[in-house]
Amino acid sequence: RPPGFTPFRKA
């Protein structure tokens, strides 16, 4: 997962 990964931002 990249450092900015969240389940709310899986663009």
UniProtKB/Swiss-Prot annotation:
Where is this protein found?
Secreted
Q: Which UniProt keywords apply?
A: Bradykinin receptor impairing toxin, G-protein coupled receptor impairing toxin, Secreted, Toxin
Its main localization is: secreted
One annotated Gene Ontology cellular component of this protein: extracellular space
Q: In which tissues is it expressed?
A: Expressed by the venom gland.
Q: Which GO terms describe its molecular function?
A: toxin activity
* Example GO biological process: negative regulation of blood pressure
The superkingdom listed in its UniProt entry is Eukaryota
Q: Which family does it belong to?
A: Belongs to the bradykinin-related peptide family.
Designated name of the protein = Megascoliakinin
Q: Which organism is it from?
A: Megascolia flavifrons (Garden dagger wasp)
